[in-house]
UniProtKB/Swiss-Prot annotation:
Record gene name: obg
Protein name from the UniProt record: GTPase Obg
CDD domains per record: Obg, Radical_SAM
Similarity comment: family membership: Belongs to the TRAFAC class OBG-HflX-like GTPase superfamily. OBG GTPase family.
PANTHER family per UniProt: DEVELOPMENTALLY REGULATED GTP-BINDING PROTEIN-RELATED, MITOCHONDRIAL RIBOSOME-ASSOCIATED GTPASE 2
Organism in which the protein naturally occurs: Brachyspira hyodysenteriae (strain ATCC 49526 / WA1)
Length: 680
């Protein structure tokens, strides 16, 4: 087992930009070839990234310095230098990044996959081609690359837990942790058995659980560095509540309690403001009268302290006298419920914080329109009457695809978050199911990448408790390389990932992925998920004219398709507005030609989806609210809105006219076509 190291310091330096090239075109019969020097590549970044599989800095403790690679210099024939490779420092959940020189906090990393760029690489220099002008057609100079950022950082990990077990050495904290959770800390009858913090999860039922942290024993003077306390006191800063574990065999249990609280107060006054519980352990070693007397003594001490220091208490702590080794039945239930109750306010606040408003543009202006997480049903080309669930704020995605109808968003993400509460979504879904019949699928789609929703598995589970309608996840597949993500999606009935390219260059051109997403890793995730998933697996291939529709590009895609072996391949193209004018649709003839090429080269069902007959049976009358909830996720034309709701274009035009007049919707000309979008 790696040694638990919770503080490390490093010198950090990003890569320097590569120099631009001074070069001139030299070819036979081209005497005035002109400058053709390429630009230098940008230097690599230094990135700190959370990895849930790591619990300390043990693997990097001996490092003194991290430096990213420099960008390569430009070359002749307008060839740009390669970007320098990034350096990624993998850290545990709960890592705080400090500027070592100023002690300022640079980042607080709380979620698996979350990243922070501590030093950015220098920009590459311009080649001499860049400096050519009408008066100087042969510049003999180029730009040097810029230096990368450089600084000293300190990393500290602070464990994230709901309950922190606090006590003197050898009071039974580790035994209590082991009894309440599946943690397996070292347990023995001598002081300082626990030399590192231990974590365990206590499950009350499917929905309710909490994390317990066992902190090494605290002795008097710990806040000043005595014993092991100072080293690990930081780990209870993030806990929601504290449990003071006190040995009933101590001569003066009230004095022990006072000493523990005093050490916490000396370290940080915020610690003693936390809710608390008191567990008096080792009742099996005393007579009933002794136990009763000591419980009364500590009750008296608690009441006195609470009376004199109300501003530092939420409320008087509950007190439990027990023996950890015989903890079961009613007493076990009482203790676990007390632990959970101590954090209820924290859980409620978390839910409130995660109910973020829908965001519709890059500057994150709040929408004044009320939008729902459940929308439709809409007529889907692939899924018939589809009731949509949108768990992601506008344009929150791991890709910035050039064909996205929502517009461009360079701030891509890979970290997961709970943007909306599961209860809120389930409430809306129940209401929608009462008002809509003949639903073919409940589909996760809409404003962004649904796998960025942290509680996706739980939400799918809750949906399956209220309906037998199959659940579909439409995903770009970018996060399927993560084992935990593949596990979360196993409960779905149908998963439709996308594959827009068969090689790295085209992948970057079309999907413009977050820099954490590697093409080969993404493809391997698609293959591995197919291996373990027992439901229906359809693969979407998005074809764009003059980008990925050539024989060579199709061959690259087909090669990967044959490795994945999906149940079906669906070929689609840009039938709606796009965020980039380069994203051009194939016509019907070209799509049919591509379909036949796929069919000739892979033994998988190939489909070019159109509106299904079953979907055309939808007779729900469209409302202004339906249009708003549709356009906020998918700006579109009158024709496509009418198709999506199986509605007359005249009816759609009439409603859109009212919405435009009210200022809720605006008209836009995109790529020469009139479309409609929601106003902020």
């Amino acid at each position: 087992m790696d040694q638990f190291i919770d503080v490390v310091s490093f010198e950090i330096e990003a890569g320097h930009g590569g120099a631009g090239s001074v070069s001139f075109r030299r070819e036979a019969h081209v005497p005035m070839g002109g400058p053709d020097g390429g630009n230098g590549g940008d230097g690599g970044d230094v990135i700190v990234r959370v990895d849930a599989r790591i619990n300390s800095f043990g693997k990097i403790k001996s490092r003194k310095r991290f430096r990213a690679r420099d960008g390569e210099p430009g070359r002749a024939r307008l060839s740009d230098g390669k970007r320098g490779d990034d350096v990624v420092i993998r850290v545990p959940i709960g890592t705080v990044v400090y500027d070592e020189d100023t002690n300022n906090i640079l980042a607080d990393l709380l979620e698996d996959g979350q990243s922070y760029t501590v030093a950015r690489g220098g920009k590459g220099g311009k080649g001499n081609k860049f400096y050519a002008t009408a008066t100087n057609q042969a510049p003999d100079y180029a730009q040097h690359g810029l230096d990368g950022e450089k600084l000293n950082i300190r990393l500290e990990v602070k464990l994230i837990a709901d309950i922190g077990l606090v006590g003197m050495p050898n009071t039974g904290k580790s035994s209590l942790l082991a009894r309440l959770t599946r943690a397996n800390p070292k347990i023995a009858s001598y002081p300082f058995t626990t030399l590192t913090p231990n974590l365990g999860v206590c499950y009350l039922d499917y929905e309710r659980s909490f994390v317990i942290a066992d902190i090494p024993g605290i002795i008097e003077g710990a806040s000043e560095g005595a014993g092991l306390g100072l080293t690990f006191l930081r780990h209870i800063e993030r806990t929601g509540a504290l449990c003071f574990v006190i040995d009933l065999t101590d001569e003066d249990v009230a004095d022990t309690y006072k000493k523990l609280r005093n050490e916490l107060k000396q370290y940080s006054k915020e610690l003693i403001k936390k809710k608390s519980i008191i567990v008096l352990n080792k009742t099996d070693m005393l007579e009933k009268d002794e136990i009763k007397a000591k419980v009364k003594a500590i009750e008296k001490a608690v009441k006195k302290e609470y009376k004199n220091n109300k501003e530092t208490h939420y409320e008087e702590p509950e007190i439990f006298a027990l023996s950890v080794f015989s903890l079961d039945g009613d007493m076990l239930d009482k203790v676990t419920n007390a632990f959970y109750k101590a954090n209820e306010e924290r859980y409620d606040n978390t839910k409130k914080e995660t109910k973020e408003p829908l965001l519709l543009n890059q500057n994150k202006t709040k929408s004044k329109l009320k939008t729902k997480r459940v929308f439709g049903p809409v007529v889907s080309k692939r899924l018939g009457n589809s009731l949509g669930i949108d768990v992601i704020p506008h344009k929150t995605c791991s890709y910035n695809c050039i064909y996205c109808q929502l517009g461009s968003e360079e701030n891509t993400k890979t970290s997961l978050a709970n943007y909306y509460s599961v209860d809120e979504i389930i409430y809306e879904l129940k209401e929608a199911l009462l008002n809509n019949k003949n639903i073919d699928y409940i589909t996760f789609a809409g404003s962004g990448e649904p796998t960025l929703y942290k509680d996706l598995k739980k939400l799918i589970y809750e949906i399956k408790q209220i309906t037998d309608i199959p659940v579909c996840i439409i995903t770009n597949g970018s996060l399927l390389y993560k084992q935990e993500m593949r596990s979360d999606l196993l409960i779905a009935d149908l998963v439709i990932p996308s594959l827009d390219a068969g090689n790295m260059d085209t992948f970057k051109l079309i999907d413009q992925p977050n820099k954490e997403i590697d093409f080969d890793k993404m493809v391997n995730g698609l293959i591995e998920f197919r291996r373990v998933f027992k439901g229906e697996y359809w693969l979407e291939v998005f074809l764009l004219k003059d980008i990925n529709d050539s024989k060579e590009e199709l061959d690259d895609i087909i090669k990967i398709v044959n490795k994945i072996k999906p149940d079906r391949v669906q070929l689609v193209t840009a039938t709606r507005r796009t965020s980039n004018e380069k994203a051009k649709a194939l016509n019907d003839e070209e799509m049919e030609k591509a379909k036949k090429y796929f069919e000739a080269n892979c033994s998988i069902e190939i489909d070019v989806p159109s509106v299904s007959d079953k979907a055309k049976g939808n007779t729900k009358k469209i409302t202004e609210e339906d249009i708003i909830n549709f356009l906020i996720r998918q700006p579109d034309t009158v024709h496509m809105i009418a198709i999506s709701f199986n509605e007359d274009e005249s009816r759609v035009s009439e409603l859109l006219k009212k919405l435009v007049e009210s200022g809720k919707v605006r008209e836009e000309i995109v790529n020469g076509v009139l479309s409609y979008a929601v106003n902020i």
